[in-house]
């Protein structure tokens, strides 16, 4: 059990934490001030001040909240919050990109990845660029080459841009996909105002590098900052290659202990074992996983139990009391129990992202860990820990959440979208065709409806969205499949072509109505034809052929409703007076339909030819229009709405609170239907998230997959 000395040290360190927080708020706090005097100033502290619950036996505690890459690069030590000296020495971290604090798309400190022109860029960190001079040349350029298989995406925040543009010092911030051979711009995003910037070159099919270009006339009277937003704020990310942390001081476990760990596991190779943390796995304690299905708690050699992951954030308590062990998922309240062998002495250091036994580095984001020695925690303790994390990271705890990323029209469970939280309230799909404009992705064609030709090269393994071409060519253009159409809308990926082969896509009977392909790649072709044209694919080869042709849909990674009879609905759930909804969805037609995203007695988001009609039951029956937009990033029950650029608009009609207990409907309402694309959604009950937390919630949802 924790000693009196341990408790006194926790009190002393808590006092110092509060003192430092007050100093950061502008107070002059001498070290001699009585502890009780802090109460007069404590209300001015931010609500997320680190006040971890006082649980028996805490000997070491780590929290990544508030850390920065700059701070950790200067002193790579993860301080033990208890003051007991079990500080973690962090080894091999880059302190930028996806190795370090926060998780950023780019590491602007890496000269291998980025060329930063220091003449124009006054200063930069791993995730921030500061400009004091506009230019007619590129200020920052990626050394990495991107393409359709490796798309450049980022979420940024610009400050100082609006002022500089208004006074004529700067024309715009441009972010450009540039051809690496010709140096010509392929696609350009241009921004003239402060705020959140979202970049995705997902429609650029060829190779490109990325330029950041603050365009102006060499003026020096500006101060503009471009900052990447982290994907995992409040976490430290290990890269799964060689990043790890270790104590210098021995942390010796007793035969009774509890370890709380908050983390997000990553995995791209299910055959590879990943050690999340531990001491000597043959003696005392270790956690590991090899897939995103479950985590193993190992309490000595060959004694282990497994617990299921949830999607994204996981919060587990691993407990031992003599020969009894259990692992509890605090998010789902599910407990797995087991037994283990006799206690083995275990003097030695403690590790994160590996253990003392194996150097199998975990690719994981860790928010924090708490180790209680000599204590088997109670359910009440567990609830306190869960509540603490909810207050520290509110955006990570939706009450309802769904994503369709990773689902396909061929999945056995394609008509169900699992709830990310693990609460079982899955979305159920009805009447979907799972082809063309009804299902996962918006496909131009259903290849099963084409006329298939049985020639020397011919189609096989034909699916709705793909087929293979096989055979031995006769050195002429051979029609593989076709349909009669007045238009072509092809975005396809071709793999398996050999040198000397050729593929014609479109209307081969008329010059200019087709494209000719001679190598593997992704190709786009759109053309209007005469009504009787033959739209198809021809293949030319003099050798054996085995080529795969796949359609790439519009709205890839989205569920698309057809606006005819497609329905998506949840089971009934309660939404109280205060709530926040965050998500990625879009109406894809301009029409006036009383359908879209609805939950009776809480909210109704209807499609309109001018934009979106928002009707909240809280507003006593009064709705309002949001023009020139087809999607919203977030909506709050206090009247706040956030547009795609995170501009805030507000409905100031007096609120009349109510509670709803019905289902949520997507793409329809009553007997009205509308076309929309749905990617993800998170619903936070009893929470009015701030704008910053809405942004964090949105960014977090974009990182999740359905499986």
Locate predicted features.
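Extracytoplasmic low-complexity segments
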Residues: 3-9, 13, 43-135, 179-181, ...
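Secreted extracellular polysaccharide-interacting domains
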Residues: 139-145, 237-250, 283-285, 300-305, ...
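Extracellular glycan-interaction patches encoded by glycine-rich segments
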Residues: 298, 337-376, 656-679
């Amino acid at each position: 059990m924790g000693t009196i000395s341990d408790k006194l040290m926790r009190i002393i360190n808590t006092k110092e934490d509060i003192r430092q927080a007050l100093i950061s708020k502008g107070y002059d706090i001498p070290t001699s001030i009585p502890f009780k005097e802090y109460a007069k100033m404590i209300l001015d502290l931010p609500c997320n001040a680190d006040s971890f619950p006082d649980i028996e036996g805490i000997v070491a505690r780590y929290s990544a909240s508030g850390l920065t890459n700059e701070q950790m690069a200067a002193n790579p030590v993860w301080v033990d919050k208890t003051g007991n000296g079990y500080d973690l020495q962090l080894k091999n971290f880059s302190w930028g990109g996806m190795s370090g604090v926060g998780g950023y798309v780019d590491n602007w400190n890496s000269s291998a990845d980025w060329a930063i022109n220091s003449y124009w860029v006054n200063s930069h960190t791993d995730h921030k660029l500061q400009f004091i001079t506009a230019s007619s040349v590129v200020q920052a350029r990626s050394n990495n080459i991107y393409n359709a298989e490796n798309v450049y995406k980022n979420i940024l925040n610009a400050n100082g841009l609006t002022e500089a543009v208004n006074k004529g010092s700067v024309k715009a911030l441009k972010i450009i996909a540039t051809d690496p051979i010709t140096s010509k711009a392929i696609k350009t995003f241009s921004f003239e105002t402060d705020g959140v910037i979202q970049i995705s070159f997902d429609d650029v099919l060829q190779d490109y590098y990325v330029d950041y270009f603050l365009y102006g006339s060499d003026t020096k009277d500006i101060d503009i900052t471009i900052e990447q937003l982290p994907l995992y704020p409040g976490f430290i990310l290990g890269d799964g290659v060689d990043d790890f942390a270790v104590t210098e001081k021995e942390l010796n476990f007793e035969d009774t202990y509890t370890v709380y760990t908050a983390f997000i596991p990553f995995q791209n190779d299910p055959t590879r074992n990943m050690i999340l943390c531990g001491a000597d796995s043959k003696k005392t304690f270790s956690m590991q996983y090899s897939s995103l299905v479950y985590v193993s708690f190992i309490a000595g050699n060959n004694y282990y139990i497994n617990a299921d992951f949830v999607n994204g954030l996981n919060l587990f308590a691993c407990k031992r009391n003599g020969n009894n062990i259990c692992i509890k998922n605090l998010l789902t309240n599910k407990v797995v129990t087991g037994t283990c062998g006799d206690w083995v002495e275990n003097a030695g250091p403690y590790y994160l992202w590996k253990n003392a036994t194996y150097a199998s580095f975990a690719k994981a984001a860790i928010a924090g860990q708490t180790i209680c020695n000599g204590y088997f925690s109670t359910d009440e303790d567990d609830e306190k820990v869960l509540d603490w994390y909810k207050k520290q990271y509110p955006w990570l705890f939706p009450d309802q959440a769904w994503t369709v990323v990773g689902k396909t029209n061929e999945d056995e469970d394609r008509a169900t979208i699992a709830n990310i939280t693990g609460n079982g309230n899955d979305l159920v799909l009805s009447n979907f065709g799972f082809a063309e404009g009804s299902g996962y992705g918006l496909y131009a064609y259903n290849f099963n409806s084409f006329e298939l030709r049985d020639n020397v090269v011919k189609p096989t393994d034909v699916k709705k969205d793909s087929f293979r071409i096989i055979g031995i060519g006769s050195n002429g253009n051979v029609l593989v499949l076709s349909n009669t159409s007045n238009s072509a809308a092809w975005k396809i990926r071709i793999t398996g072509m050999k040198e000397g082969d050729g593929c014609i896509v479109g209307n081969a009977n008329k010059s200019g109505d087709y494209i000719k392909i001679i190598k593997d790649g992704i190709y786009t072709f759109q053309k209007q034809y005469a009504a009787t044209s033959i739209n198809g694919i021809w293949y030319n080869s003099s050798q054996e052929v085995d080529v795969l042709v796949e359609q790439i849909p519009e709205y890839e990674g989205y569920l698309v409703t057809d606006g005819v009879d497609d329905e998506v609905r949840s089971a009934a759930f309660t939404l109280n007076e205060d709530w926040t909804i965050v998500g990625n969805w879009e109406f894809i037609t301009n029409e006036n339909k009383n359908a879209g995203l609805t939950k009776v007695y809480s909210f109704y988001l209807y499609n309109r030819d001018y934009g979106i009609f928002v009707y909240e039951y809280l507003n006593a029956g009064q709705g309002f229009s949001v023009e020139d937009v087809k999607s919203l990033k977030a909506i709050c029950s206090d009247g706040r709405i956030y547009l795609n650029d995170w501009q805030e608009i507000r409905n100031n009609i007096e609120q009349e609170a109510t509670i709803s207990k019905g289902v949520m409907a997507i793409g329809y309402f009553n007997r009205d239907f509308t076309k929309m694309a749905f990617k993800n959604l998170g619903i936070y009950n009893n929470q009015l998230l701030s704008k910053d937390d809405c942004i964090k919630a949105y960014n977090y949802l974009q990182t999740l997959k359905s499986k």
